[in-house]
């Protein structure tokens, strides 16, 4: 009699929403199958972020990321990670109106195994969110510092420093929740208003640079593993000197090749 392995339990939106006020949600970015497979057993959520345009393609911002790019990398991540809840960023310009947003969101669902899509914007996106959720698409919201608005904002600026911004952020969060977003990313928001939003809404918040009171946290993997030393945001904690470790390994490899120590007899065929 053949032994059957237990089916892999995929993290769902219900699982994540059940963690609200109970257990912190662990999220990280990934852009390929290799790292997705490494992260798989350790995280609840993987975001295929348009941040790949900066960390993977060395561009200055996220704005030139395309739908095709996001689909390609989402397919790779889904091939490597089987259990986390996988979110695909909708890139700049891909949800400019309801027709365009529906077309691109449906492509994500048809062409990948992504669990949800994420879009940036506040209460002005509420109608769009409802349209998408009415079609069966799980939408993750994103407010605060929104990278797709970096040129309009004149840079990456922390939000929630004054009463007007705080009021808008809370209104945005409540409107998006009512419209049907399943999770809400809070980026670059001052801690007090991030805490207030987290307390006021019933869906989980996932913070990045928004203090410890959010229901979960997310970081760009190459930031937290120390692969970029040219610029490190205040909110990033490095858990590894990845760039240094990799460079040292390559140096050892190069040295072995130059000295004729690689390959040796055990690494050769006869």
From Swiss-Prot:
SUPFAM superfamilies (UniProt xref): Phosphoenolpyruvate/pyruvate domain
Binding locations of Mg(2+): 50, 89, 120
GO CC annotations, alphabetized: cytoplasm
Superkingdom of origin: Bacteria
Localization of this protein: Cytoplasm
EC number: 2.1.2.11
Ligand binding (3-methyl-2-oxobutanoate): 50-51, 89, 118
Main location: cytoplasm
UniProt KW keywords: Cytoplasm, Magnesium, Metal-binding, Pantothenate biosynthesis, Transferase
Cofactor(s), by name: Mg(2+)
Enzymatic reactions: 3-methyl-2-oxobutanoate + (6R)-5,10-methylene-5,6,7,8-tetrahydrofolate + H2O = 2-dehydropantoate + (6S)-5,6,7,8-tetrahydrofolate
Keyword match Mitochondrion: no
GO biological process entries: pantothenate biosynthetic process
Pathway membership, UniProt: Cofactor biosynthesis; (R)-pantothenate biosynthesis; (R)-pantoate from 3-methyl-2-oxobutanoate: step 1/2
Active-site residues annotated for this sequence: 187
Function (record text): Catalyzes the reversible reaction in which hydroxymethyl group from 5,10-methylenetetrahydrofolate is transferred onto alpha-ketoisovalerate to form ketopantoate.
Subunit structure: Homodecamer; pentamer of dimers.
Family statement: Belongs to the PanB family.
Protein's name according to its UniProt entry: 3-methyl-2-oxobutanoate hydroxymethyltransferase
Organism: Helicobacter pylori (strain P12)
Record gene name: panB
